[in-house]
């Protein structure tokens, strides 16, 4: 295994206030027009802080842009939950839709439906795959091809005892900046098996505004550079201060206070195909573990339960989880990841 460090474009915020979004120029096909519409209707003229696609996708202006640019996917595809015999394809559609993914070789098919319950995202599961095998795939939405000229593929994980070489890329601190999004193409050229998103994957800094959080995810996920990388690369994500709360924030030991913590967690879950998210509804968070062959990865959450007075980053439940997982691990290599 080789670890490839990718330094993503970051904007370090000196205060708790979010900086204005860097706009994509209006003359950039699709993205300029679409971003401006989203900003006006989800952010500047939106009083509902929990707003998402369901609040705008029936508006004539939105429908006109979707039709004009032939948009079938409003995010994705992103590869996730890769095992030796399975994987999921995460994606978002502009409205409720039937989605089908077909992987080759083997004509392996998965189907799912998107709905407003998860902000029109879903995970299409592909089962019965072979270990350490390259698969190409197609996506249709309501029976129509959805990927245009994109021809994505992914590789399944090796079996535990299978000795293989693979690359993992990792990074964080990635404010959406239209002129810098080319970084994703540079990462893609290294053909990593997976990418570890180590927090500050977006600079949101407004934990009370789910509408802003969703808007920022849309902006990143609609970038063609990001799509080219993540449609063929397994994603593993945790957050840090700027995509969880605000600069240098500490969530505290109470799982449900401040009251914004769980809603932020729910938005995060909509947007990442992780194996699981912390301790679930009773102990929310973004920590999880996974393995690739003889390497065990432990993705930690250093914000949700951080408490400066108590001197803890993880909180007692997550710390117990981490120690137990490390003790139980039989892998030759163990990688602990933190934002």
Protein language model annotation of sequence segments:
Residues 13-17:
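Sec/Tat signal peptide C-region and signal peptidase I cleavage site
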Residues 3-12:
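Sec-dependent N-terminal signal peptides
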Residues 19-339:
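Metal-dependent phosphoester/phosphodiester hydrolase catalytic core
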